[in-house]
């Protein structure tokens, strides 16, 4: 059974203690306060029953690392202030059975503090009016790959971080209208072989908003970082970067069933760190008209993968600096309105080329899917000998070719116009 605790300064021990107010309902007897134990925020590996904070409290954390295996619930519009003035960034470990559960109040952390999840420890902010404020918030797992600690913001809960929020939990979730994580920089990743995989789902109206940067993966990490945006969830930042073993997924991660798309709102998405190539954008959703308007950039030659697995996604940014690889699977469709840089395209699904006026498409295309010229005048100038699918030219659109290699062995279905500008003799034997 949960008990309601109150914090009391212990002069002899020079620390805060948690007292349980045990009230007797027996007629004629007075309630009495009993000091259960000195559950101090300054001791390590302490044990206590769950603590409920239902009135305003202020705690000085100190410089020593601390570990708790009980649940602290903040409710009834209470305000809990934790002052962490030591610049060494002390660590609060939420061990198995422990967690910070903000369900109806506010927690403010003044100064640097690391949250470490061990076993099944958790950090939860749920329900409208529940908020966590911090200058910096480093949320990390315990370094064990099998830990099941989790991070959850749901049902209108909010986290506000002035500078950097670093997430390295095994599982994370931001879900529900009004649920937000707001930070200067939002980072997911671990150094080298430390920690397990990081996974965060932003869904059903939940949001992750960074004023400066969303960063996925670390340059030499050996674990995987996955950020999934689905079912109307939203991430926003001026820049999103993908480093080693990182995946930004619209709908669902690769290998999972497609879901409704979310929203990726960014000015630039950049693939970084040239020594590794395992970084990708996954398009795996059920929408017919999803859009990514960011400019997609390869920080070094050949970096990055764009994999269209399910649904139709239009890339409407200036992607001239992208030099990675594009894969369109049988149930996927990818639309290009400006360019896709110098990327090579393996098309087993559908490639939509949609020009407002004119477009020169010099990319090398292979596969047996469909190239659809939807609008404008599109000049196919690349070496597409390995393409054996179909080329559809919509009514009002114009496809321009100059050599036989531009259309490979494709069959053609022309409702608009096919313009051939040949500067040498060649046999046109495409169906």
Predicted regions span which residues?
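Extended active-site and interfacial segments that coordinate phosphate-rich ligands
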Residues: 32-34
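Extracellular "spike/adhesin" assembly and maturation modules
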Residues: 2-28
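Beta-strand-rich extracellular passenger or scaffold domains
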Residues: 47-431
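Short, Lys/Arg-enriched charge-dense amphipathic segments
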Residues: 29-30, 260
